[in-house]
């Protein structure tokens, strides 16, 4: 697989809308790996289509498998045999590190956006993005992929652990990847939901009269 496709995968996966990343596969229960896979392949497809069209050839994958996406992305003038196995391996590196966050950082509130750790969670995301870009510039793609997996886990946990959707938001929270923008309407530890196991509290009205963002 060419380094160009690796750059596409690494550079643009984080640009996938975070809410899009939570579309279940096959109508079943979403896991971190299924969410990550859906988001990455969707973004790679979108990006490869744009790159192919800019190069003057059609992007017409014969299917949605990683192998078929790789062949369509590289185009008809690609030399040699296209390796879907290498693409699979690159994706697996991301999936593995994504899943290991639950094992290696099980008690870290910022890694999972628990206990109102908004600022710490965003810091992990933004610092991770800086590290990803730096590793891409150095062509250290494996390190970039591994960091991407970890960052995506924390980003996913924001949407699954917070009341973002319950508050009526349908767009990604861009402030999570923009350290120059403030995180607004945040609940503190003393104002968070007193019964977080009970998800039947619409917008947590007793605890959040001003519709504060909480976990």
Residue ranges and their predicted role:
Residues 3-17:
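Cleavable N-terminal signal peptides of Sec/SRP-targeted secreted and luminal proteins
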């Amino acid at each position: 697989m060419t380094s160009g496709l690796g750059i596409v995968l690494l550079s643009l996966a984080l640009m996938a809308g975070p809410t899009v990343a939570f579309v279940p596969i096959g109508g079943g229960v979403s896991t971190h790996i299924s969410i990550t896979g859906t988001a990455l392949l969707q973004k790679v497809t979108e990006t490869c289509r744009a790159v192919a069209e800019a190069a003057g050839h059609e992007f017409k994958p014969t299917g949605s498998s990683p192998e078929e996406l790789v062949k369509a992305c590289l185009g008809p003038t690609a030399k040699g045999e296209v390796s879907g196995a290498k693409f699979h391996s690159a994706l697996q590196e991301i999936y593995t590190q994504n899943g290991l966050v639950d094992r290696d950082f099980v008690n870290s509130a910022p890694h999972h956006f628990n206990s109102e750790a908004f600022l710490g969670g965003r810091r992990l995301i933004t610092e991770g993005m800086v590290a990803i870009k730096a590793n891409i510039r150095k062509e250290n793609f494996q390190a970039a992929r591994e960091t991407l997996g970890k960052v995506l886990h924390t980003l996913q946990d924001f949407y699954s652990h917070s009341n973002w959707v319950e508050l009526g938001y349908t767009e990604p929270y861009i402030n999570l990847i923009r350290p120059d923008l403030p995180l607004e309407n945040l609940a503190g530890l003393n104002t968070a939901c007193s019964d977080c196991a009970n998800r039947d509290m619409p917008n947590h009205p007793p605890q959040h009269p001003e519709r504060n963002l909480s976990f």
